């Protein structure tokens, strides 16, 4: 029984699915997808649970969410192992994901009060009050790269705001989704407040097409995000929050400390085997001897990165990709760029055929025409050389995406210029592109999102504002508007 609907664990009636470890091939999870009728049942359960959940005092909702945080801490080792085995990422990185999930609770509570709490302004004849109300029933679509943390970034603020939810994890990480939901069950969520439906495209389409949804919160690829946007077009009454990918530039302008710059680049491009939406995909390096030395050192150090199993001891910096098919897609993207005229500086290599272990690749594309403006979700870094800083900014902005952008430079003025001219939701200076703070918004422009950033701003799309003018009693104004006459006439 792998679906959780209205507080009950039930068996899916859709397609049979199994999840294997992307490196060892071990079967980790088996179950059936939710069919359309079960998806509708989950929505009905969420709708029925909404009035009571929304009317709960905030403190009552907060108490359950905080109990979930306690359970996450108590089961940190177990959840770390599930995430590591299911995604292929090393245990150390899976552990940081669970820590991020735990930290999200306190941050989301603070954000709720800061972004969507109650504010009151006293007036001469009463008060003006701002309150916030939950949308109702929301669908949450989770990604596979952070199958615990990223859905958590939607689920926690949505529950705090008083919404009820239907959660569909990625079909590539059903085990993590189920494990997290079992912790929510133990935290004491009332039946129907949070529902789990497993499945792939058909389940997702059934969920996103439900008439009774009040909104959809999505993290994933641009192609799926665009599809959801088209599907919900003409329905302005539904909130749609899209967090999509990027073709992110990292500008290397000043590399006086070459090893520090190389370390920052490795963290930006290859952490999580390149499977973070903020990962650097395009490396822009200034022409000249300093840039040459930086690239040579980058190729040298990156060439020593050996992806390992999730359970290796000592642990590796990167593990496997989410699947052998994902690794093959990266290889095909590299070969495509070579065919266009790219010069390979470091060839990616499959460590073992049939697994998702893939070494990093670096290819120079300076002067190459018609390079696809796409997000290759893996450890492939494209290099362009530039002559002056204005050209670097032009190259950085030469993308339909706008998620993250970074600069390595000792010149504050260059960073100030980048802040003014970059089209990206995250712009970092001498920090990895993959570094983000939950106390700040997280999102992008262009094909990277629809202006609904998450993290600190997630509270914004989980509730709508209600403005009120209030007075405890009704009195006739001392001064009337022109043309109004309230004088009493004598009876004839």
Swiss-Prot record:
Gene Ontology biological process terms in this record: arginine catabolic process to glutamate; arginine catabolic process to succinate
Superkingdom of the organism of origin: Bacteria
Stored SUPFAM superfamilies: ALDH-like
Reaction(s) catalysed (UniProt annotation): N-succinyl-L-glutamate 5-semialdehyde + NAD(+) + H2O = N-succinyl-L-glutamate + NADH + 2 H(+)
GO terms, molecular function: succinylglutamate-semialdehyde dehydrogenase activity
Active site (catalytic residues): 243, 277
Signal peptide extent: none
Binding residue positions for NAD(+): 220-225
EC number per UniProt: 1.2.1.71
Entry similarity comment: Belongs to the aldehyde dehydrogenase family. AstD subfamily.
HAMAP family assigned to the protein according to its UniProt record, in alphabetical order: Aldedh_AstD
Function in brief: Catalyzes the NAD-dependent reduction of succinylglutamate semialdehyde into succinylglutamate.
Name recorded for this polypeptide: N-succinylglutamate 5-semialdehyde dehydrogenase
Lineage of the organism: Bacteria, Pseudomonadati, Pseudomonadota, Gammaproteobacteria, Enterobacterales
